[in-house]
């Protein structure tokens, strides 16, 4: 008789929901910023990841809070704030792997949506669409962990400024 072992459950990441939690676009001086700017603005981008364990079993909310400011000659041209989140269910995943998945893989899943919202918001604000560069979350988390001696649950803030 052949002994059959119970098949090991495979690790699984399920995206249960994605949504905009907060969105703000400020254009403080549209006449001057849309018609009188002659040089390329300086773009500053800050990104923060917030991870919250939800009451449901193995469910987590991962938020990307993004702030983008454009300035020219020390005058603010526009400012965008986007908080975009996803609900993720992690099944059969070790605690060590959860930290990596929640701080790297989940943000990688929702970041393209943040990028699209920023692009569309700047375009609808009268500017050229602003395409935020790809972010290597694994590299940033690695650098953050080295600097912070690995916190219990990673809550990094990144300055991912691109000079445009």
Curated annotation (Swiss-Prot):
Single Gene Ontology BP annotation: protein tetramerization
Molecular function GO terms recorded: unfolded protein binding
Record has Transport as a keyword: yes
This protein's UniProt keywords: Chaperone, Cytoplasm, Protein transport, Translocation, Transport
UniProt subcellular location: Cytoplasm
Gene3D superfamilies: SecB-like
Keyword Cytoplasm: yes
Predominant location category: cytoplasm
InterPro entries: SecB, SecB-like_sf
Single GO cellular component term: cytoplasm
Complex and partners: Homotetramer, a dimer of dimers. One homotetramer interacts with 1 SecA dimer.
Role played: One of the proteins required for the normal export of preproteins out of the cell cytoplasm. It is a molecular chaperone that binds to a subset of precursor proteins, maintaining them in a translocation-competent state. It also specifically binds to its receptor SecA.
Family designation: Belongs to the SecB family.
Identification of the protein by name: Protein-export protein SecB
Name of the gene encoding the protein in the UniProt record: secB
